[in-house]
């Protein structure tokens, strides 16, 4: 799952190592004042640690020092973004998020703001755990990455952000399926239906929706609600006719005496697919 984005970082690293120091006169009345640690020196030390030593944590510290000693300068702006990138490379995601958020807040109109926002989303995304764990970070990843797509649709990061959103949504749907199966095995059919319903209504574009529809047929049959069971099967068959899950749902409904191709258009299942612009069957 680890995807180390380096597009902007590569461009920043190519910045000449001896750019003139900027902005000192803005903060010091004495034109002869020489900072103990000049910004260009600190910045170049950070680049050396980042590129040559691959000591990302120490590199981030150098970039942070640039920001502290030369606030509001062009050096500070560049260093803040490089700090976020270095923290990301060091797997220090919370620090990366903090630096990247600060960059977006201070420099919302910068051409590099899209990358900073992308780093925020990627930091959350890289912390998504398996479906048996809480998915709070998946939600944060989706929110942050959606901001990339919404605010910077023409940026080079929008497509990658969209892909990660899809994978994060798939992860969240998988969590709902995991809990739903648990309830189903406990014969808590209402609890299971509520979980599978989340997948059908909120995560229809994920790979889990096929199984969710079949499981709904299974649960409704167990409760004796054949109308909903056959609607779930009909919607499944119409949208995924070659799915192995449809074959299972078809057989379940048939065995229960229902008609797996008959859809109740007033069912929440049918309405959920209509709302998303997805197709439903012509029967019902």
Task: Outline where the language-model segments fall.
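Acidic, polar-rich low-complexity tracts and alpha-helical solenoid repeat scaffolds
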Residues: 2-6, 20-284
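Bacterial N-terminal signal peptides
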Residues: 9-20
């Amino acid at each position: 799952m680890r995807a180390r984005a380096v597009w902007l970082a590569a461009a920043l690293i190519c910045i000449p190592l001896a750019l003139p120091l900027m902005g000192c006169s803005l903060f010091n009345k004495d034109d002869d004042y020489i900072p103990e640690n000049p910004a260009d020196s600190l910045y170049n030390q950070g680049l050396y640690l980042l590129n040559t030593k691959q000591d990302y944590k120490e590199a981030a510290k150098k970039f942070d020092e640039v920001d502290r000693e030369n606030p509001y300068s062009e050096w500070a702006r560049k260093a803040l973004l490089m700090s976020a990138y270095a923290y990301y490379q060091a797997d220090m995601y919370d620090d990366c998020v903090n630096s990247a958020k600060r960059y977006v807040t201070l420099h919302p109109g910068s051409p590099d703001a899209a990358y900073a926002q992308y780093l925020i989303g990627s930091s959350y995304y890289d912390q998504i755990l398996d479906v048996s764990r809480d998915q709070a970070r998946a939600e944060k990843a989706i929110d942050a990455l959606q901001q990339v797509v919404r605010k910077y649709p023409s940026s080079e990061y929008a497509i990658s952000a969209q892909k990660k959103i899809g994978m994060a949504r798939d992860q969240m749907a998988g969590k709902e399926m995991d809990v739903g199966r648990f309830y189903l095995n406990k014969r808590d059919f209402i609890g299971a239906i509520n979980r599978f319903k989340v997948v059908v209504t909120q995560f229809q574009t994920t790979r889990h929706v096929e199984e969710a529809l079949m499981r709904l047929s299974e649960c409704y049959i167990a409760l004796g609600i054949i109308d909903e069971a056959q609607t779930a099967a009909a919607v499944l068959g119409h949208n995924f006719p070659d799915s192995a899950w449809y074959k299972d749902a078809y057989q379940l409904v048939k065995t229960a005496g229902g008609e797996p191709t008959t859809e109740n258009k007033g069912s929440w299942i049918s309405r959920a697919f209509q709302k998303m612009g997805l197709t439903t069957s012509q029967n019902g």
